[in-house]
């Protein structure tokens, strides 16, 4: 729904999934307020008028802009659902773009028309749960060669690519100056830029991939002394970035 088509006082029929979430998960009753979103920036503040029928009345609404400094997760395919866990948590944290990656050591395989549907459902569900107004953009699955191209484009556009690797010598603290500089530049000129976080599969990123990404301009760093799972490394890095960018205020 377009914000131009809305007015305060209008009554809306909630989609069945939203109605179930409001009644069963949130335990809302008639007269309780709730927030709705179309996943494209429109946020609606409403009051539930008929919980059983899913009827809500619009109180106010507005369009929320996307952040100037965008966060993207390049997540390698991982077995036993670790990749889906990663994008779920990343969405709750505030990731703006998700790029599936068929890494050299990925055991799981991307199945067009099936895996992308599952990932999209995860993103939409996490968006709804976290009350976000924007659903993260889901890109097509990329190969390692295409990730190299992403790194090269990032260098040209003034973006940043951070590769998480357990054997890296550079620490996250050493990247913070560059992160702050990129954020300040975005605020000054208003031109959107993206910070990409790249996470490998269970078997890690191959030496050949690390070398190729580094030559293409990516920063390779380690997140502390503990080895993180494929499901947690990305969300941890995104949390640090969100805090550095002032999203956690």
Question: Where are the regions a protein language model picked out?
Answer:
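N-terminal positively charged helical leader segments and presequences
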Residues: 1-64
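Fold-independent oxyanion-binding glycine-rich loops
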Residues: 3-4, 16-17, 39, 77, ...
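Hydrophobic side chains in well-ordered alpha-helices
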Residues: 22, 83-86, 209
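Short connector loops at helix/strand junctions that flank enzyme active sites
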Residues: 29, 43, 66-70, 93, ...
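RNA substrate-binding interface of SAM-dependent RNA methyltransferases
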Residues: 65-163
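Active-site/ligand-binding-proximal alpha/beta "capping" segment
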Residues: 158-212, 218-222
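Structured adenosyl-cofactor binding patch, chiefly the S-adenosyl-L-methionine
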Residues: 207-249
């Amino acid at each position: 729904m377009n914000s131009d088509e809305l007015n305060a006082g209008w009554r809306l029929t909630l989609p069945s999934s939203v109605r179930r979430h409001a009644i069963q998960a949130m335990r809302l009753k008639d007269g309780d307020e709730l927030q709705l979103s179309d996943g494209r920036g429109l946020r609606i503040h409403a009051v539930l008028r008929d919980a059983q029928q899913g009827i809500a009345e619009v109180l106010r609404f507005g369009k929320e802009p996307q952040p100037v400094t965008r966060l993207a997760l390049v997540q390698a395919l991982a077995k036993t659902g670790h990749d889906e866990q990663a994008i779920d948590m990343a969405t709750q944290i505030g990731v703006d773009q998700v790029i599936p990656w068929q890494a050299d050591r990925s055991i799981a395989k991307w199945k067009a028309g099936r895996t992308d549907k599952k990932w999209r459902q995860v993103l939409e569900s996490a968006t709804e749960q976290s009350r976000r107004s924007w659903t993260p953009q889901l890109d097509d699955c990329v190969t390692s060669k295409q990730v190299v191209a992403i790194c090269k484009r990032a260098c040209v556009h003034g973006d940043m690519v951070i590769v998480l690797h357990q054997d890296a010598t550079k620490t996250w603290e050493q990247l913070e100056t560059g992160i702050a500089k990129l954020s300040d530049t975005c605020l000054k000129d208003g031109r959107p830029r993206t910070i990409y976080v790249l996470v490998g599969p269970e078997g890690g990123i191959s030496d050949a991939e690390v070398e190729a990404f580094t030559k293409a301009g990516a920063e390779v760093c380690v997140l502390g002394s503990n080895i993180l799972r494929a499901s947690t490394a990305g969300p941890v890095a995104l949390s640090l970035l969100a805090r550095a960018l002032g999203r956690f205020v």
